[in-house]
């Protein structure tokens, strides 16, 4: 009888080394970094003339990336003699970078720094004890950060320039279902490009460019992303149709929730997503269904990240199922 052995990732069917995969992910993020600095730094400074506004995006991005490296080093230095090489191979800064681009520009910097440090430290310590990685560190960090914001200062994606020109944050309007106010803020194209209040470095148009690049470089689990986005698109569109909402409002919901960014850089995270084609598709569908429940129906601002964490629990079963199917096809 043939045995099925499931190992820890990353599992991307490519001849690329892991460090090259992470390098490609960083390259895909570069346009978003530039966008974040321009829209939430340079443009804001040109209107407010406040030098602090100019450097806010840069500080948030750099410090979040650095604290990822520091946490990786501290948690791994005792057991790994080649920790510096390991950090370089894993591109440890990517966790903090991906998290930072998803945050409000005016978030107190200490919140993501503390959370990112603790999440990476806990991840490394736990993974060494059980020899596997149970949860998506990016999703966990974002879940904790948004949970803290939700119960303290509240979640608001407006930068200081937008605060003077726009009364309401589109993200909160979507949670309340205020379609009329959303149409006043911008057209569908504005939401797609990112020319509205949104996360620090999220532009769905630029994310899709990065996604295409990653597919070409075979550095992303595209089945996870596509099945996740398609599931959400179909369900959100159907719910909107039942409610009599305009089709464009359904699309705006997807863009405001930053679902495209989450689908490309969070849900399909290299180490914490399934390893076979069928399990990748099923995983994306599960995350999509859970996201509908927590984010749309229950209106939890951190619902999508909670969905990813819960879906992580199904990965071993999905991989086992996918491996069995693959084995049958092989026989």
Where does each model-flagged region fall?
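Conserved mixed alpha/beta catalytic, RNA-binding, or beta-rich assembly cores of soluble enzyme
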Residues: 204-205, 216-248
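Long hydrophobic alpha-helical segments that form multi-pass transmembrane helix bundles
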Residues: 131-210
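Small-residue-rich segments of transmembrane alpha-helices in multi-pass membrane proteins
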Residues: 91-101, 139-153, 231-239, 258-265, ...
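A generic, well-ordered mixed alpha/beta core segment in the N-terminal half of proteins
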Residues: 83, 87-163
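C-terminal ends of transmembrane helices
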Residues: 7-12, 68-82, 120-131, 208-218, ...
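Loop-to-transmembrane alpha-helix initiation sites
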Residues: 134-139, 251-259, 280-282, 298-309
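N-terminal signal-anchor module of multipass membrane proteins
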Residues: 1-69, 73, 327-331
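Structural signature of hydrophobic alpha-helical transmembrane segments
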Residues: 50-66, 106-115, 191-205, 247-259
């Amino acid at each position: 009888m043939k045995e099925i052995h499931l190992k820890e990732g990353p599992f991307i069917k490519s001849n690329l080394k892991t460090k090259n995969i992470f390098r490609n992910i960083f390259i895909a993020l570069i346009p978003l970094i530039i966008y974040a600095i321009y829209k939430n730094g340079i443009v804001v400074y040109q209107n407010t003339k406040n030098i602090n506004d100019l450097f806010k995006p840069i500080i948030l991005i750099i410090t979040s990336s650095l604290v990822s490296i520091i946490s990786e080093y501290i948690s791994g230095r005792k057991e790994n003699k080649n920790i510096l090489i390991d950090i370089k191979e894993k591109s440890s800064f990517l966790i903090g970078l991906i998290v930072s681009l998803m945050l409000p520009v005016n978030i107190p910097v200490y919140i993501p720094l503390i959370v990112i440090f603790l999440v990476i430290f806990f991840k490394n310590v736990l993974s060494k004890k059980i020899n596997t990685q149970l949860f998506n560190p990016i999703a966990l960090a974002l879940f904790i950060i948004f949970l803290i914001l939700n119960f303290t200062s509240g979640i608001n994606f407006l930068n200081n320039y937008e605060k003077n020109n726009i009364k309401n944050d589109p993200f909160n309007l979507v949670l309340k279902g205020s379609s009329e106010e959303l149409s006043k803020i911008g057209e569908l194209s504005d939401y797609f490009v990112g020319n509205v209040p949104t996360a620090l470095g999220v532009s769905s148009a630029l994310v899709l460019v990065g996604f295409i690049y990653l597919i070409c470089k075979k550095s992303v689990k595209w089945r996870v992303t596509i099945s996740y986005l398609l599931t959400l698109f179909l369900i959100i569109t159907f719910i909107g149709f039942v409610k009599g909402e305009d089709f464009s409002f359904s699309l705006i919901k997807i863009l405001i929730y930053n679902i495209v960014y989450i689908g490309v850089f969070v849900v399909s995270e290299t180490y914490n997503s399934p390893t076979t084609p069928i399990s990748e598709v099923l995983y994306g569908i599960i995350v999509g269904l859970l996201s509908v429940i927590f984010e749309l129906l229950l209106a939890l601002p951190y619902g999508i990240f909670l969905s990813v964490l819960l879906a992580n629990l199904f990965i071993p079963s999905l991989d086992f199922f996918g491996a069995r199917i693959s084995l049958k096809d092989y026989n």
